[in-house]
Amino acid sequence: LLIGQIARGIDGREAFQEVDFTQLYSGIAKWVTEIRDPKRIPEILAHAFSVAMSGRPGPVVIALPEDMLREEVMLPPQLPYSAAVEQAPTTEQLARLSSMLAEAISPIMILGGSRWSEEARQAIVLFAERQQLPVAVSFRRQQLFDHTHHLYAGDLGIGVNPALIARIRSADLIIAIGARLSENPSQVFTLFDIPSLKQNFVHVHPGPEELGRIYSPTLAICASPVSFALAVVDLPMAHLREADSIHRDYEAWTDVLPQTPGAVDMSEVMTHLRDKSPEDVIITNGAGNYSIWVHRYWRFRHYGSQVAPTSGSMGYGLPAAVAAGLRRPEKRVFCFAGDGCLQMTIQELAVLAEHKLKVTVF
């Protein structure tokens, strides 16, 4: 995030539009800085991208004093590129994970977070199939596993299937990949014992600060979902387990429509859209409770088919749909938005119309 700042030399005097951005953003950004010397632009931008992409990805804020922007300096024609720092499981960690899988009777895997890829998703599917692992997904991370797969168990968001909650509580091994297991997935921190789970707990996360932050893992692995998925796909097969029943529970939860009062039944609306739409449609939504019907009844099939906020920001759905339409113009995009949520960013309808995007707003 690049923000204009008052001129250098008058800061601290409450000049017109002066803001202490370090104080304002330090609680919600990974790094806040200011470029006071234009010669350092390549250095600071390279570091900013590295910080933003490494570990748990997050925002970086850079303030730009207005007088600094008017200076002329000689810089290289191409700025340096800083890739995200990658870490992978060690041989010892993989051996211990394999041993825990061999001993487990009722394991379950939970997928979440960011820094995934299509390759990682495919590798995790193969890993789950080889190990006969039921797979749940974290809050608004439903694109990470095909909902029609016989190992898919459901999502840990708002209005969770009680059968999934029971299955997790009775599990003897929980493997969380990329997920932090924060308020919504943990059902307001009631689903797992704190700080030590009664089950064996394997926590895989690219940010070391997240490992042991709330839950003490039996095995902590600092790795991105991509590097972990590619490392575990060829682990020895564990013994056969019965894993299909949890998918039948999911199907029952999403096929049986509860009776609701009123002329419009949103569960019927959602299942009708689901059954009549192409399987690769991209779904976006904002933060409101109206999204409960989307999360319960839509069956996500492909990676990249869901764009939704986990931070609780209203107004997210429409600009997300515009971005998806611009990025993948050949795809149909459905945006679900409540009235207040839509009005937060309703001006984006102009962009949608200007570019003639294949976006439908519900």
Where are these regions (language model features)?
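Short, flexible loop/turn segments with low-complexity composition
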Residues: 61, 239-251
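Short, well-ordered alpha-helical microsegments
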Residues: 117-120, 229, 291-294, 345-346
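Thiamine diphosphate
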Residues: 1-8, 31, 163-165, 170-183, ...
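Conserved structured core elements
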Residues: 118, 125, 223-226, 263-267, ...
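Short, glycine/acidic-enriched loop or turn micro-motifs at the edges of active sites
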Residues: 208, 289, 342
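Active-site diphosphate/adenylate-binding microenvironment
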Residues: 247-330
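N-terminal alpha/beta PP-like core and its mobile active-site loop of ThDP/TPP-dependent enzymes
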Residues: 1-239, 272, 276-279, 351, ...
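Small/polar loops that bind or transfer phosphate-bearing groups
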Residues: 36, 111-112, 285-286, 308, ...
